[in-house]
C-alpha cells in the first residue's frame, strides 16, 4: 500500500492525545524537585510561626521562589518528625532572619527552567497538530462520496482529461473494421493538418457517432483516435451526467464544454450516449425530467448560439434507434459510422492481432477459425482465443491445438461444458432429436450447412446441432425461411417417428418458439402468406422512449384470426416436410444415432459423407471447412 502522510497523521491522532497527558504529567509542575519532597500534612502560616517560636521546627526547604516551604516538625508526644507543607506569603522579608536567629536549617531550591520550556513547547505543539489532523480529516471526508464538500462539486464534469492521451492503442491495433477506421483516420488528419481541408473550403466535422452492436470495437476506435490525434482528450460515459439533484446534468455539460474550449483543439468521447440522448416525448415520466434538461444543454453546446470551433465530439451507442432526432442531425453529428460485425477477412485480421501473444500449434489455421466464426464480433474473437489459451494451460500443454480451439468455440457459442449423459433411453431420445435437426438441414437445399452435432451438454441444452449460415447473404428468401422452419421441426419429427406421439418431450419447446416467431414474421412483416404483400406489424415504439402506453392494433379481429391460421399453416407445412424426410431416411438416421451415441460428437463433413451413402446431398452455396 502506498504510504500517505495524511493517513499516518490521522492514525496518530489518538496517540497524540495520550502523549499530551503523559507530557503534562511529566512537566506539569514548575519544579521537578517539589514532587520528590512530599509532605504528610499541610500547615497554616500562623501555626508555622508558632512552631518556630516554640523551637519545634528543625529544617525548612523553600521552593517556587520562596512561595512554598516543606518544614520538618518534631512531635515530642510521639517522638518522631513530621513533614508539612506551608504556603508562605509574598511579603515576608523578616522570615529568613527569624529562621536563622532560631538556628533552623534553611535550604532554598531554585526553579528549573527546562521543565517550563518543555511544558510550553508541549502546550503549543499539541493544539497545532490537533487542528492539522482535524483539517485533513475534514478534507478527506469532503472528497468521499456524500461528503460535505461534494455539494460544491456536483456541477463539475466527471470527464477524464488527458493532455497527451496514452491509451496504448493505435490504429494499427484496430483490425477488421477498415471502413470505420478510414472515416476516423480522416478526423485525426483534420486535427493534425487542417490546412489541407481548409484550403479547399472544407470544414472540420463537429461530431462522429459510432453505431454498432456490442463488442464490435467502438470504444477501441475511440482509444485509437486518442492515441493517434496528439490533442487533449476528454472521455465520459453518458450515465455520468445525470445525478440525484436537479440541474446537475446540464451544469456538467456546460462545465465539460467550458474545459474543452479552454483546451481546443481537442476531442470529447461520450460512451453510451443513449443514456442521456434518448428521444424526447411524453411517454412515462413526462417531458420535463432531468435527462431532457441535460439533453437540451448538450444540443445547445454542440451546435447552439455560441460556436465550439476545434472541438470534435465522438460518441458511441448500440441503440441508435432511441436517439433524439435533433441530436442526430448534421451540425451536431455530421457522420454516423457503422461499426458492424466483421466479415471473413475482418475476422482473420482480428484473429491475427489477438494471436500475436498466443502460442499456436502448427496445425492451427487462423483462416479456418475465421471461416468457422461468422457473426462473431471482435470481442467474441478475443474471448475465443483467450478461452483456448486458458484451456491449454489447464490441460498442461505447451501450445494451443485444434482441440482447444474447437472447445473454445463451443464454449463461446453455447456455454460451459456439462457432464456427459450416461447411456439410457433419455440419451438415445436426445440423439434422435439432434440427428433429426441435422438430417433435415442437410437434405434441404436452402438450409444452412451442418457444422457439428453433439450430445455433450452445454448451458441449458442437453444436446446441440450447429448450422453455419452463409455470411455473404444479406437477404433471406421464402424458401430459406421455410427450410429453417422445417429444420427446427426436425427434432420433434424424429421423436414422433421413432417413439410415437405419446413419447414426445419438452425438448422441442425452444424449437417451437423459434418456428412460431419465424412464421409470424413471414405473415405480418414480410408478406409471405396468402394475406398478400402487406405489413401488419405495428411500430408504435417503446413506452419509455416516448411511445404510446398501449400499442394500437392495425387490423381487425377477422384479420388477426387469419394471421393465426397462416402462422399455424406455415408451421405445419414445415413439420410435414421434416416428418417426410425422417420417414424416408430412417435407416441412415438410425446409423447416425448409433454413431453419435458412441462418439458423442460428429462434425459436419463426416455427417454429410454418411448421409451421401443413402441419399443425394444437395450442393450448398458454401460448405464451412472444418478445423
From Swiss-Prot:
Pfam families, sorted: AAA (PF00004), AAA_lid_3 (PF17862), FtsH_ext (PF06480), Peptidase_M41 (PF01434)
Ranges that cross the membrane: 8-28, 118-138
Locations listed in the record: Cellular thylakoid membrane
Deleted gene: phenotype: Cells have decreased chlorophyll content, with a 60% reduction in the content of photosystem I (PSI). The PSI that remains may have an altered structure. Cells grow normally under very low light (10 umol photons/m(2)/s) but are dramatically inhibited by low light at 40 umol photons/m(2)/s. Under this light intensity they also photobleach. Reduced rates of D1 processing and degradation are observed. Mutants show increased tolerance for non-ionic stress by maltose but also an increased sensitivity to high NaCl concentrations.
Annotated Zn(2+) binding sites: 433, 437, 511
Key word Ubl conjugation present: no
Active site, UniProt feature: 434
Lumenal compartment spans: 29-117
GO molecular function: ATP binding; ATP hydrolysis activity; ATP-dependent peptidase activity; metalloendopeptidase activity; zinc ion binding
Topological relation to the membrane, as annotated: Multi-pass membrane protein
Organism: Synechocystis sp. (strain ATCC 27184 / PCC 6803 / Kazusa)
The keyword Kinase is assigned to this record: no
UniProtKB keywords: ATP-binding, Hydrolase, Membrane, Metal-binding, Metalloprotease, Nucleotide-binding, Protease, Thylakoid, Transmembrane, Transmembrane helix, Zinc
Protein name: ATP-dependent zinc metalloprotease FtsH 2
Recorded GO CC terms: thylakoid membrane
Binding site for ATP: 212-219
PANTHER family in alphabetical order: ATP-DEPENDENT ZINC METALLOPROTEASE FTSH 2, CHLOROPLASTIC, METALLOPROTEASE M41 FTSH
Gene behind this protein: ftsH2
Function: Acts as a processive, ATP-dependent zinc metallopeptidase for both cytoplasmic and membrane proteins. Plays a role in the quality control of integral membrane proteins.
Expression triggers: By UV-B light and oxidative stress provided by methyl viologen.
Record note on cofactor: Binds 1 zinc ion per subunit.
Record topological domains on the Cytoplasmic side: 1-7, 139-627
UniProt record, GO biological process: photosystem II repair; protein catabolic process; proteolysis
Gene3D superfamilies noted in UniProt: 1.10.8.60, 3.30.720.210, P-loop containing nucleotide triphosphate hydrolases, Peptidase M41
Binding partners and assembly: Homohexamer (Potential). Part of a large (>500 kDa) complex that includes FtsH3 and PSII. Coimmunoprecipitates with YidC.
